[in-house]
Swiss-Prot record:
It comes from Human herpesvirus 2 (strain HG52) (HHV-2). This is Tegument protein UL51. It comes from the Viruses. Phosphorylated. GO terms for cellular component: host cell Golgi apparatus; viral tegument.
């Protein structure tokens, strides 16, 4: 009877209430926070209005946009470094054989840097930043960077343009610095005695005009041996006269 009254009056056991967790604000994982901060620093250096970490983590699309902008910003900085190095090359003064390659790479770097900058500004500053055109531009820029081996190729050309390579350039000159070339080395010391020894060997057959130091080893015969030869001939002619 009591149980019946309890059921009718609602005195029975109540079901447990559901537990709800508070939704926290978007926060990056602890291992990914340094990379996101570095990406923000690189991207904000190119944006007129900087963005915050909360703006980047507001949605998944914004996070992906930050990752793509970071790749574009790194590509942009690599292009600017290569342009700065290639600008030190003076056409016609040092290694004329690489003037065409330097000019071609300079145009390619400038075009790629402008593409990266325009894409970053479109992703964050334009109204229609959520369309797929930004993804296409990002893919094209990254593909262009990978296919042409811009980093390795431009470093090699910049080293040759700045004279950092030890190999000699065409024309027999070696680049010594920015806009200066070093002439080929002159005759060494070992070649000078050979030129001076030619008249010495020919002049040994005749008596010198003025006294000078006698060389230690003279290949010419001694003059005393030449004077003794007529004496031996004279003694041979006098021998028959004495016998007669």
């Amino acid at each position: 009877m009591a149980s019946l009254l309890g059921v009718l009056c609602g005195w029975g056991t109540r079901p447990e209430e559901q537990q709800y967790e508070m939704i926290r604000a978007a926060a990056p994982p602890s291992e990914a926070e340094p990379r996101l901060q570095e990406a923000l620093a690189v991207v904000n250096a190119l944006l007129p209005a900087p963005i915050t970490l909360d703006d980047a983590l507001e949605s998944l699309d914004d996070t992906r946009r930050l990752v793509k902008a970071r790749a574009l910003a790194r590509t942009y900085h690599a292009c600017m470094v290569n342009l700065e190095r290639l600008a030190r090359h003076h056409p016609g003064l040092e290694g004329s054989t690489i003037d065409g390659a330097v000019a071609a790479h300079r145009d390619k770097m400038r075009r790629l840097a402008d593409t990266c900058m325009a894409t970053i500004l479109q992703m964050y500053m334009s109204v229609g930043a959520a369309d797929k055109s930004a993804d296409v531009l990002v893919s094209q820029a990254i593909r262009s960077m990978a296919e042409s081996d811009v980093v390795m190729e431009d470093v090699a050309i910049a080293e040759r343009a700045l004279g950092l390579s030890t190999s000699a350039l065409a024309g027999g000159t070696r680049t010594a610095g920015l806009g200066a070339t070093e002439a080929p080395p002159g005759p060494t010391r070992a070649q000078a005695p050979e030129v001076a020894s030619v008249p010495v060997t020919h002049a040994g057959d005749r008596s010198p005009v003025r006294p000078g130091p006698v060389p230690p080893a003279d290949p010419t015969p001694d003059p005393r041996h030449r004077t003794s030869a007529p004496k031996r001939q004279a003694s041979s002619t006098e021998a028959p006269l004495l016998l007669a």
